[in-house]
A protein has these predicted regions:
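Low-complexity, acidic Ser/Thr/Pro/Gly-rich terminal tails and inter-domain linkers that flank the onset
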Residues: 273-301, 381-411
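A glycine-rich, often tryptophan-bearing local segment used as a flexible ligand/cofactor-contacting loop or short
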Residues: 573-655
């Protein structure tokens, strides 16, 4: 008997809380299909604060081994965190970490939700977090997710107290408890309510757990086990899923065997966690060998895009496509088109910027309405690379023009030249546009006429920027915003995301450029070396100060490379990511002994350090940081040359900082070191390890845990003045 299948297509909207639609569809393996047919009805919602907080091993075991329906609710998108992959911070980092969550869910089989809370950086108190999050809004989002997903059980990753170690972590548990209690109240009035709330505890918080047994509100679960349908164990899958959090450096050796997990009942009635026993499914595969995709001619949707839906029948049976039409997509399908085995059918489904954007749904059944199958497709742009092979990326709604600059922040002494790049997308006809700038605290010359040639997507130009002769008294910073004549909306900047474990895409952010107009003195003739870390703006910041920067390869570093340099700056987290520093250490130390200045930016005190030996004078890193960016600084050595030359630093240099003062301060150091600053978050003891410096032979070594990498990008004048003093130290008569 031959089965025939019909399709119905229409647009749908994705909820802001739910998971994304699929970029394309192909029939699962028979083993995966039967795995998905298991009739276990347990639904579990796992809640934590950030991308990477979730226990992917436990989620994978529940989802893929036990057959439970699992979802993860991340209250933030992690935009306030660190990035070991590259220079992206803020909104761009949030997109990277959001996509890493989706990549993890594609492996562990869970659904992904978001809570819409802002990741404003590390927080030491739950009170600060709840205030900045607007706890009622986040609580409402948690309740909305719970009502949509309808879990039997809610599981938090963190305890609802200070043991969680981060205000965001604590707040995620506190709000989960409040949401559970409110829903329980609704349940008593006849509404839906989850049955129990557990905390996924571990020996990290309770050292005596290793010998614990189930009972007294504690459940001890043994997880792990081979899944024949997938050819992997649940721990393997969970490890691979965790490895998708590459921006946080969470890939590692694949876990196998068994693992013990602990669940502490916080609210509600105990749940029976006995693993279910399954009976092998004998249900027939609905449509084996079905493939469908929706592809467009470009990844950028400005006005409209030609696009097509393609259906490929690789099964042994015919399928049928029912006529459908959607006004937003322009999809036209002839009625009752039969698609024979081995055949491909394609029809236009164009995209329009003024239409309703969402996923295209293919509802698949046979002619008798059996074997129902719903496929939700999102449009993609497909290309290829001779090394990487097929490359797919999402189609994005895109403005016609965007602006970019050579620098993340412009330092204007008296005047400066700024290189500007005007990009355009969509159709590329020959055209002329008028570009102009509005400056706050700076003066920009006349408007720029830009003439694009047919097919030209970017125009490069330079503009003159200078301080106004009569500026605002005391103004040391400003901004520059670009417009096109006839358009009152400022141009945005597109940040390209190009990491192969997540879809390539652009992140559209505010296109205004921070400007620093403060008086910054920099000695002439400074020549500085830079060794890469995890990605920061130090080279650009130094060039803005008029410093000549030489890029150095740590793995092949020689004394000849260092000849003539007064300082060498290591990028942020260099000792966490740059293996070449192991070989470079003896060379750098010899150079310091003979008069060089080694400047080490912040590194994390983790096991991934390439070496514990971070300089010629010993010091150790701790986990101290100051997170309240308004915290006043106490100058411990106000007359030290690094505090006075060539710029006399003052409290004003710590005004306007963003997110934090510094992180991963030194916790122990040789007596040769001089700590330059002292400060503390409210209620804490003062910390002195943020900025320490010591002589070594005829040279100097400095560890600077200040968050300069954030402040340079934000246009904080004091961060540039501090940088100038760091670089100029060896010209102040303290070395060769």
């Amino acid at each position: 008997m031959t089965r025939t299948v019909q399709f119905c297509l229409f647009f749908v909207f994705s909820t802001v809380l739910g998971a994304q639609s699929l970029p394309n569809f192909h029939s699962p393996s028979e083993g995966k299909f039967h795995l998905d047919q298991r009739a276990e009805s347990m639904r579990i919602l796992y809640i934590a604060a950030h991308p990477d907080d979730e226990n992917t091993r436990l989620i994978a075991h529940w989802s893929q081994f036990n057959g439970y329906d699992v979802a993860y609710l991340s209250l933030t998108e992690g935009e306030g965190g660190q990035n070991i992959l590259g220079p992206e911070l803020g909104e761009a980092l949030g997109v990277i970490r959001r996509e890493e969550l989706y990549a993890a869910r594609r492996l562990d089989g869970a659904t992904q939700y978001f809570g819409g809370a802002a990741d404003f950086g590390y927080s030491k108190t739950v009170d600060e977090t709840l205030e900045k999050w607007n706890e009622n809004e986040v609580l409402a989002r948690i309740e909305a997710v719970v009502k949509e997903f309808k879990p039997d059980v809610i599981v938090t990753r963190f305890p609802p107290d200070a043991r969680a170690g981060h205000g965001h972590h604590t707040a995620s548990a506190v709000l989960a408890i409040r949401a559970f209690e409110r829903l329980q109240s609704m349940g008593r009035r006849g509404g839906y309510a989850p049955k129990a709330l557990y905390w996924n505890t571990s020996s990290w918080w309770a050292k005596d757990l290793e010998n614990a047994v189930s009972g007294d509100s504690l459940e001890v679960l043994q997880i792990g086990g081979f899944i024949p349908e997938l050819g992997q164990s649940s721990l393997e899958i969970g490890t691979l899923a965790r490895g998708m959090h590459k921006s946080q450096g969470f890939a590692g050796i694949t876990d196998r065997g068994e693992r013990t997990e602990y669940l502490r009942l916080l609210k509600g009635e105990p749940i029976d966690w006995t693993p279910p026993t399954f009976v092998a499914s004998s249900a027939p595969m609905p449509i084996p060998g079905l493939y469908a995709e929706w592809t467009a001619d470009s990844p950028y949707l400005v006005d409209s895009l030609q696009a097509r839906v393609t259906v490929i029948n690789e099964s042994a049976e015919a399928i049928r496509v029912r006529r459908a039409l959607d006004k937003n997509s322009g999809a036209h399908i002839p009625p009752y088109t039969f698609l024979q085995p081995g055949k491909t059918y394609s029809f236009p489904a164009n995209l329009y910027a003024n239409g309703q954007q969402g996923g295209m749904v293919l509802e698949v059944t046979n002619a008798d309405g059996l074997w129902p199958q719903t496929l939700v497709l999102s449009p993609e742009y497909v290309t290829s690379d001779r090394i990487k092979g097929e490359l797919r990326r999402p189609v994005q709604l895109t403005p016609r023009y965007s602006i970019s600059y050579d620098v993340p922040c412009l330092v204007v002494g008296g005047s400066a030249t700024l290189n500007v790049h005007l990009h355009r997308y969509g159709a590329l006809p020959e055209e002329s546009v008028q570009l102009y700038f509005q400056g706050d605290g700076v003066f920009v010359g006349k408007d720029s006429a830009v003439r694009f040639l047919a097919g030209q997507s970017v125009m490069h130009l330079s503009i003159a920027v200078r301080k106004p002769t009569r500026g605002k008294a005391g103004q040391t910073r400003g901004s520059l915003t670009a417009y096109l004549h006839g358009d009152e909306v400022p141009l945005m900047t597109a940040i390209p995301i190009r990491y192969d474990h997540i879809p390539h895409q652009e992140v559209w952010v505010d296109g205004s450029l921070p400007i620093v107009t403060a008086d910054i003195t920099v000695p002439k003739g400074l020549q500085v070396g830079y060794i890469d870390g995890a990605g920061d703006d130090a080279p650009e910041a130094m060039k803005q100060l008029g410093v000549e920067v030489k890029r150095l390869n740590a793995a092949t570093l020689t004394l000849e490379d260092l000849k003539g340099l007064t300082s060498v700056v290591l990028g942020i987290r260099a000792f966490n990511v740059n293996q070449g520093l192991v070989a470079a250490q003896p060379v750098l130390e010899n150079w310091v002994q003979n008069g060089g200045h080694l400047i080490i930016q912040y590194n994390t005190a983790t096991r991934d350090q390439v070496t514990d030996h971070m300089g010629p004078v010993p010091f150790k890193l701790g986990r101290d940081r100051v997170t309240v960016e308004e915290t006043p600084a106490t100058f411990l050595a106000p007359t030290h040359p690094m505090m006075t030359y060539p710029n006399a630093l003052s409290e004003a240099d710590f005004d306007g900082w963003v997110q934090e003062r510094g992180l991963y301060f030194a916790s122990e150091w040789d007596k040769a070191f001089v700590p330059l600053l002292e400060w503390a978050d409210p209620g804490e003891t003062p910390k002195q390890g943020a900025w320490i410096t010591a002589p070594s032979g005829e040279g100097q070594v400095t560890y600077c845990g200040l968050s300069l990498f954030r402040e340079w990008r934000a246009g904080v004048p004091g961060a540039y003045r501090i940088l100038a003093n760091l670089l100029a130290f060896q010209t102040a008569g303290h070395g060769k």
